[in-house]
Amino acid sequence: MSVRAVRRAVMLVLVPAALLSQGSTPALDFSGVLFGNFQYRTDSAARAATAGQPGDRFDLGRAYLNFRLPAGDRGAVRVTTDVYQQTGTAAAYYAGWAIRLKYGYFQYELTRDLAGVQGLAAAARIGMLQTVIVEHEETFWPRWMGNSPTEFNGFFSSADVGLSALITLPNRYGEVYTTMVNGPGYSSGENDRYKDFAGRVSITPFGRDSGFLRTLTVTPWYSVGALASQFVLGGPGQVGPVSQGLEKNRRGVFLGIRDRRLTGGLELAQRLETVESGLNTAASPRLTSDVTRDLVSGFAFVRPLEIFDPKRRSPFSVFGRHDRFDNANVVGARNILTWFGALWDVNARMTFSIDYQELKAENPPVVPPTNTTVPTRSMFLHWVVNY
């Protein structure tokens, strides 16, 4: 056999194998977000830690790394790592930046024509996934500047471990999202036997239009859950273990719009909880009370030059946000967040903001409980890069 014939035979074997290898390699979709800030604090708490002088520091907020891969027929996997600085007890061992999992779930596309309705799609997820409302809010409020209203005020963590279902409505009319999760959030493991069940319906009534109201979204949502009693195991001197769960419900409605000229949101929400007091002993019996805490939040981002001239793309915008959240301990006491500033787009993927943030207690109790809000006043230089 000639050398040319041998070479031809080898090529006939290797080329199909190479093509098969290329065809069987799944496509990796990688993206990321990196953001941080410089902050200058002038409140009394900051001055107390610096001998009466204002405090300042550079901070790296987060580095999110997103990996998306197909996983078989109709299947896909998303893994998002969260690079953050250690705090709390973990900082005693290592106070630097660490990596943890933010999202890690498998998604299976059930159908694109649910119940025979064309365009009515359904998918299911399992793993560490989005909670009911936070990521939806973050399509209107930029996470790199700070937490969304519900996450900032302790309603939810942004991710948790469990199951979820997503139904996409036809003709761009919105979606339905439901979850069953552990409850503590992605930064903690499960700590009791209870689960949180939640759902939202996001309606875009003008989704098929091409005008300003195309992204207007109305989202009612509800979450039902419970917490274990602090006396679930009983103990020395107690009258016995407490097996009943404590109410941990949340509900609200979010209204949002997303356009280059104006992006904003308005949220009305409630935290409904059962709290315990006493020591669960004969001398100090366990008592429970139901507490409802109201949240009213609104924010807006405006590009004033584009409002006056829609054909002109401007890198400059201004924003403001105001949160009012009830204090659980005293009637009439509230935590007030005031936030405003200006943003500048360096390019299509990087943005800076200069903003002022103040958190204060309105009508604080005369004898503060341990969870009373510590007033803060800060100037920030925020920055974000998407890649």
Name each model feature, range by range.
Residues 48-53, 84, 88-94, 148-151, ...:
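Extracellular loop and loop/strand-boundary signature of outer-membrane beta-barrel proteins
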Residues 41-50, 336:
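Juxtamembrane/transmembrane-helix boundary motifs at the membrane-water interface
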Residues 194, 202-204, 210-328, 336, ...:
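Detector for outer-membrane/organellar transmembrane beta-barrel domains
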